[in-house]
């Protein structure tokens, strides 16, 4: 009887819990079908059980994982609200929503956007990487405009710096000669870096533009002039160097800083005097009457003759040894106004070299008061030179001690050579 068997099969599928009750009455109905009936009911029961088990598995998967996540500890709590997080980076990212911090900046040129999350930055970077996007084209235009503005700034800086270098061409001709002829004329390293920086910015003829360039500091002009004067005049041969160094065509600011250049290189070359070889000492002896810097290595010989620093302070006593100091009396007559202008403004800023120039300018004028200084210096005995000496050099020594600059070696040699070593006892 096929219809009852089919009905029993559908009922097993729809109602699996009635498998036992339905299967027992079906067996007496047809005894010939008994071998096939258990197999059909077993297959139907397996299918029903599989169908009945599928919904709980599909429905219970997500709640089970959620329960596990809820059971995990949340040690990272937000200090500004009640939320807690499993991981530290999640807490950090959440705190940025309170503080407004945006540490992730776009690296595309011209783009100034910042983001608090790295995934937002990654999503934003795709805008720049996509060439078909309108925003990427706009960003490229902004970047090009920013680059053009930066290029204009650089061009303005280059044009401003290019206004001075054309006069610096004569210096390139004289610089190799000065390096070969007189290597120890270079000042200490700090001053060389400072002076080279000033020289590149101001140029060799900066002393002629003092009155025109009112915006520049006169101290910087004096520094550049001193460096230029050394590079120009010490690099030529002996004869023209003497005439160009003391010709009346020089301005006061160009001539007077040579004292500072001489003072600095005087101390430095005195320290290097023991390192000279025979070939270089020959060049020093050849240029001694004309080069004020090269007279410094032979200063110990002057100190034995009681004339060591006297070319700096009493030019009447040593006209033959130091021709550089002889025209300083005429310089006071030529341009006194420029000299006083440089005197008043150079001590305002205190680089190394313009500071001690004040006492040096007045010391030659003090030496011109009485010709008795030459008579006193010509006396071989130191005891005869004791009493009159503090009248003139005492003021110069005090003026040199007041600035506290790099003239300590010169002042000590002055006290020993002029006063016979006991100048400090009379103070």
Swiss-Prot record:
Residues 15-52, 289-303, 404-419 have a biased composition (Low complexity). A zinc finger (C2H2-type) spans 76-98, 104-128. InterPro entries: creA/MIG_C2H2-ZnF (IPR051007), Znf_C2H2_sf (IPR036236), Znf_C2H2_type (IPR013087). Interacts with creB. Residues 272-281 have a biased composition (Basic and acidic residues). The gene is creA. Transcription regulator component of the regulatory network controlling carbon source utilization through ubiquitination and deubiquitination involving creA, creB, creC, creD and acrB. Represses the transcription of the alcR, alcA and aldA genes by binding to a GC-rich region in their promoter. Also plays a role in response to carbon starvation and the control of extracellular proteases activity. One of its GO terms (cellular component) is nucleus. This is Probable DNA-binding protein creA. One of its GO terms (biological process) is carbon catabolite repression of transcription from RNA polymerase II promoter by glucose. The keyword DNA-binding applies. Ubiquitinated. Deubiquitinated by creB, probably to control its activity or amount. Residues 1-70, 117-140, 164-185, 269-333, 348-388, 404-427 are annotated as: Disordered. Gene3D superfamilies: Classic Zinc Finger (3.30.160.60). Its main location: nucleus. It is found in: Nucleus. It holds the Pfam family zf-C2H2. PANTHER family: REGULATORY PROTEIN MIG1-RELATED. GO terms for molecular function: DNA-binding transcription factor activity; RNA polymerase II cis-regulatory region sequence-specific DNA binding; zinc ion binding. The keyword Ubl conjugation applies. Belongs to the creA/MIG C2H2-type zinc-finger protein family. Keywords: DNA-binding, Metal-binding, Nucleus, Repeat, Repressor, Transcription, Transcription regulation, Ubl conjugation, Zinc, Zinc-finger.
